[in-house]
Regions:
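The substrate-binding groove and active-site-proximal loops of carbohydrate-active enzymes
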Residues: 122-123, 165-175
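Bacterial Sec-dependent N-terminal signal peptides
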Residues: 1-29
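Contiguous, structured surface segment used for ligand recognition
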Residues: 20-162
Length: 175
């Protein structure tokens, strides 16, 4: 009987330790769903206390976007990523890099690429980069305090479906 109690206690302790992992997984099942999500085989990017958010120097709007993302990551994980302006062509590791890409067709379109070395969010304009940040922000678990967030490797391409943003509320037909 004593051996059975010890075995049950050891099993419960092992199960409790296994459930207390310090890693949380991000999920790209966000609303609205991006137009194209392609996951790749490979290790995820680890969002932890050592991550840097980089943006092109002399771009105040992307600096503001970087600070916005840093504040959100701090709220969700208690890590405060530093933001840094980088020169054109400068490479940074373990970073979320914001940038502009005139090759993207839509002004509000973006491409979010995740590799084990980092994340890049490129848009044709600063607005496109902002919408890419929103997709990344929504994929991070809301409660990941002190945990390393594993962001799956892959690429997301998205742009607005319509040329306008808005809604129509017909109060006359609301019964």
């Amino acid at each position: 009987m004593r051996k059975l109690n010890h075995a049950l206690l050891a099993g419960a302790l092992a199960l409790a330790c296994a459930s207390c992992t310090a890693e949380k997984e991000a999920n790209y099942q966000v609303i609205p769903l991006p137009q194209e999500v392609s996951l790749t085989q490979g290790n995820p990017f680890k969002l932890n206390e050592n991550v840097l958010i980089a943006y092109p120097e002399n771009n105040a709007l992307l600096q503001r976007n970087a600070e916005f993302l840093s504040e959100y990551i701090q709220q969700a994980t208690n890590y405060a990523p530093k933001t840094k302006a980088i020169a054109a062509g400068e490479q940074v590791k373990n970073a979320i890099v914001l940038g502009l890409d005139p090759g993207i067709a839509n002004k509000e379109g973006y491409v979010l690429t995740t590799t084990p070395e980092g994340i890049s969010i490129n848009g044709q304009t600063e607005n496109g980069v902002f919408y890419g940040i929103q997709t990344l922000r929504k994929s991070i678990p809301a409660e990941a305090k002190g945990a390393t967030v594993l962001i799956p490797a892959g690429e997301i391409k998205d742009e607005p479906r319509f040329s306008y943003r808005g809604m129509h509320l017909d109060v006359g037909r609301h019964f």
